[in-house]
């Protein structure tokens, strides 16, 4: 499958200009391993950028079981979809390793997306990659006929 040979699961590459830009506008958050920093139903009120470390993001099934949605490492954003839509989180997120995040509050995120092509393009690229990752996940699920007439 072509997905196995793609770079979809990798961030866009380390961009020192982007990192400096985010550091200038964000609030640093240092997390120990196994720290939960986002819960289902929580209004996160902003977007996180992973500067160092690794995070895992889980969904909960109807039977209460957890499923790993994705693992993100240095260079990824998290929370951009729920931030744009002003919706609560639909995942549980935790640090897997010592992790450094930068949090951009809701208003700052929207302003930077509007004003900075560098920032906007990075967010759009990563959102597109996450969409393709989810599409791949759907591809591997068994399909159940629904009886379309």
Regions found by a protein language model. Name each.
Residues 1-33, 77, 82-83, 115:
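Cyclic nucleotide-binding regulatory module and flanking cytosolic helices
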Residues 7, 99-100:
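Short active-site oxyanion
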Residues 10, 35-97:
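Cyclic nucleotide-binding regulatory domains
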Residues 23, 42, 98, 139:
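Generic anion/oxyanion-binding catalytic loop in active/binding sites
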Residues 114, 118-149:
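Polybasic "coupling" helices that flank or enter modular domains
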């Amino acid at each position: 499958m072509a997905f196995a040979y793609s770079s979809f699961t990798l961030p866009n590459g380390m961009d020192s200009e982007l990192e400096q830009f985010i550091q200038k506008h964000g609030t640093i958050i240092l997390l120990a391993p196994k720290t939960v920093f986002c819960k289902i139903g929580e209004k996160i009120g902003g977007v996180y950028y992973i500067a160092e470390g690794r995070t895992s993001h889980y969904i909960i099934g109807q039977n209460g079981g957890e499923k790993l949605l994705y693992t993100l490492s240095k260079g990824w954003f998290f929370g951009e979809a729920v931030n744009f839509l002003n919706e609560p989180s639909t995942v549980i997120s935790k640090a897997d390793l010592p992790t450094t995040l930068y949090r951009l509050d809701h208003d700052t995120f929207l302003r930077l997306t509007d004003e900075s092509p560098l920032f906007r393009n990075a967010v759009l690229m990563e959102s597109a990659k996450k969409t393709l990752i989810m599409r791949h996940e759907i591809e591997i699920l068994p399909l159940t006929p629904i009886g379309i007439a």
